[in-house]
């Protein structure tokens, strides 16, 4: 990686401002954390900084409070969870303090009170509208708390906000945290120097959400497997009548162009060859399996890939040395239409020799539900950020870091 890493810096007795992603799901009243995965993901970076005697200031956003203070989106519940998680292998309790604001006199005073090996968690950055506006004065105030800036929030790296981009203009050294480094290493290698054969599996409802990813990956992959609702826009563009299945009528030309590009590049572009059809969009719908290129029954819609498609996709996945998967194969949240997604999760996990990278909420949920998450080489923490990276875009939060 060409960017400075936290490992390249001397952190001892210095104020380190670390942008983390603590955008965790909370209970209805905002008092309980219901899933602490995002906190756990960044623990190695936090623990690294504390071992190296940093005075650590943590900053994050949580939810969308729209630039106003809203107790429902307070980061206060994170303090206790963070203390618990940090205590597991540290002999003395880690001191985690909380600042009721992320800028201003109180934040400044609390940061000055920090001793080496202690933590200060700032209140939600998005309680200030200036954060998302990337306001330079607000960024300068954040920077005034520290000597070193570390970004470990890959999930926000595609946003040019004050805490991800603006702040870097006011500190001498800006480095990637360990999680950020891992994300860039895995995703970067997949795009720049993948082990071949390289297979990408792209699912989800809409072609419009993923067409830029598909377009970029067609320059890199050996095979592209398409599932989910978007498959029916591709099939329709080839002239198949897909009944009531989801089709983006205004994207048929784009779908056709992608198929043509695949042919031109010699990329195997695999669409489902059979489908699980439903008579309505509901968990208790009547279902039937349909195969072939003929017209779907008029009032029916495809909500999952069928058994032959699973077989076809599994074979491709088994032969791959690099696998990137983003998006479900069907309406994964309904058990009747989750088979395709679960089968793909299993197939990716079964290929233990491949470098497997998974991004996107449904794909990640599928590998967790199938109990195979530990067999995946890299599960990306950033939905939108990993998509933009796979599109070939430069991420503002990464570009802003200091070059080595």
Swiss-Prot record:
CDD domains: Phosphoglycerate_kinase. The keyword Transmembrane does not apply. Its main location: cytoplasm. GO terms for biological process: gluconeogenesis; glycolytic process. ATP binds at residues 210, 333, 360-363. Pathway: Carbohydrate degradation; glycolysis; pyruvate from D-glyceraldehyde 3-phosphate: step 2/5. It is found in: Cytoplasm. Its EC number is 2.7.2.3. It catalyses: (2R)-3-phosphoglycerate + ATP = (2R)-3-phospho-glyceroyl phosphate + ADP. GO terms for cellular component: cytosol. Substrate binds at residues 21-23, 38, 61-64, 126, 159. The keyword Kinase applies. Keywords: ATP-binding, Cytoplasm, Glycolysis, Kinase, Nucleotide-binding, Transferase. One of its GO terms (molecular function) is ADP binding. Monomer. Belongs to the phosphoglycerate kinase family. This is Phosphoglycerate kinase. It comes from Acidobacterium capsulatum (strain ATCC 51196 / DSM 11244 / BCRC 80197 / JCM 7670 / NBRC 15755 / NCIMB 13165 / 161). The lineage of its organism: Bacteria, Pseudomonadati, Acidobacteriota, Terriglobia, Terriglobales. The gene is pgk.
């Amino acid at each position: 990686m060409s960017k400075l890493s936290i490992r390249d810096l001397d952190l001892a007795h210095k104020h380190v401002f670390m942008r983390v992603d603590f955008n965790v799901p909370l209970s209805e009243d905002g008092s309980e954390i219901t899933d602490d995965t995002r906190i756990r993901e960044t623990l190695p970076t936090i623990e690294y900084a504390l071992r190296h005697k940093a005075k650590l200031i943590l900053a994050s956003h949580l939810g969308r409070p729209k630039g106003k203070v809203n107790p429902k989106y307070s980061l206060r519940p994170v303090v206790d969870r963070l203390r618990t998680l940090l205590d597991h292998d540290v002999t003395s309790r880690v001191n985690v303090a909380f600042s009721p604001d992320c800028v201003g006199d109180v934040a400044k005073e609390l940061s000055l009170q920090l001793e080496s090996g202690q933590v200060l968690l700032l209140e939600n950055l998005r309680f200030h509208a200036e954060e998302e506006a990337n306001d330079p004065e607000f960024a300068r105030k954040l920077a005034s708390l520290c000597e070193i800036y570390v970004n470990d929030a890959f999930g926000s790296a595609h946003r040019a906000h004050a805490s991800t981009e603006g702040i870097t203009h006011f500190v001498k050294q800006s480095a990637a945290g360990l999680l950020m480094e891992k994300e860039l290493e895995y995703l970067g290698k997949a795009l720049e120097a993948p082990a071949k054969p390289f297979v990408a599996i792209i699912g989800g409802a809409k072609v419009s959400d993923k067409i830029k990813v598909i377009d970029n990956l067609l320059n890199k992959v050996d095979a592209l497997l398409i599932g989910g609702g978007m498959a029916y826009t591709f099939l329709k563009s080839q002239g198949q009548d897909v009944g009531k299945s989801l089709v983006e009528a205004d994207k048929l030309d784009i779908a056709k162009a992608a198929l043509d590009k695949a042919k031109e590049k010699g990329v195997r572009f695999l669409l489902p060859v059979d489908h699980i059809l439903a008579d309505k969009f509901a968990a208790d719908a009547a279902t039937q399996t349909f195969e072939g290129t003929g017209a779907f029954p008029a009032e029916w819609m495809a909500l999952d890939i069928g058994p032959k498609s699973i077989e076809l996709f599994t074979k491709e996945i088994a032969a791959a040395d690099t696998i990137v998967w983003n998006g479900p194969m069907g309406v994964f949240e309904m058990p009747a239409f989750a088979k395709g997604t679960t089968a793909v999760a299993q197939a990716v996990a079964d290929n233990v020799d491949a470098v497997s990278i998974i991004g996107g909420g449904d794909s990640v949920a599928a590998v967790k539900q199938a109990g195979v998450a530990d067999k995946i080489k890299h599960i990306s923490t950033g939905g939108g950020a990993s998509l933009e990276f796979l599109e070939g875009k430069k991420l503002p939060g990464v570009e802003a870091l200091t070059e080595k």
